[in-house]
Amino acid sequence: METWVKAPFLKEASVLIIGECIQSAFPKLWDEFAKNRITLTSCPQAEGFSGLTEKLATLIKCSGPKEIAILTIDGSPHCNMLHASANAASFLTETDIPTKHLVIAREGDVRELSSETVRLSRYLHLVEKCIQRCPDLIDDLGSLSLEHRSAERRRTQCLMIHDESEA
């Protein structure tokens, strides 16, 4: 996120922080969400959690934006970091700036997530608890994640080999 955190245009502005890859992957969504907002780009993979959090906290302290919206790709661990950084920056600055967590889901539809959803994603034992209570989430995951489908294929192949060796 390359900007001076005290830039006059940030003072009490509506700020959109958007994953860098979105402009090329979803240009119409970029245009739609950038309307009437100061738009900053970030590549969480390149910038890292600590750097992003520090930059966001400093921006909040120095410029006091009216609101912050984060728009990223759903399913990207790097993009998840941008949402977590926004929550951490609010915590560190002890401010309650309205924050929207937005993700571009499959087929390009945008979904708003609560700050609590972002926080929950950091606690894997709680995510596991959610899966145990709602196992059909794994079916949903299968429709979204190539990694999951590949792991399931390998697991099935191992089970078949194991069954053949016992026969």
Q: Each predicted region: which residue ranges?
A:
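Iron-sulfur-associated redox domains of electron-transfer enzymes in respiratory
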Residues: 1-167
